[in-house]
Amino acid sequence: MALPGDWILKAKESFASGCPNGILLGWDVERFFDELKCACPAQKIRNLTDFNYSYCNKYEIVPEQVPGNGRHFEATASFSFVCNAFSFHWTSYSLDRKRGKVVPDELLPKEIDNPRQTLIDFAKEKGFDEIDNNWMELEIDGIELELADTATLGKCLFDDY
């Protein structure tokens, strides 16, 4: 398993000449998409990858919803191009999807099929480690991002916002 110091060094290397541009670097916008659809056939998976202030592939996983619970749940899986780091989280939305917040697995209705372990296994098979949520806010000196005032490990590996 990677340590945050390893990922911080890799981020510093990747950002040494400025923010990496996935389009210019030829990053694959479809990386893992078809394989994820096969790994999680019960869920709808949408590719949200773009390289506007993002340094990862981002996939939204929409499980079958539970009628009558008053919330809509979606998962997000991100695979960094900066290093082999993987992130997974759930968002709970109001039914109109205008308001949402990240929630732990424990707050999911038990009827929702949680693909977390399947995605962790998939990521490990591809050589990726899941980043500990406590590491996402680790500040990195010497990196200037385009949007964020402070460079953090999460912003350098996944999204600069």
Predicted regions and their residues:
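Acidic, proline/glycine-rich low-complexity IDRs
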Residues: 119-161
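Extended, charge-biased low-complexity segments
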Residues: 2-126
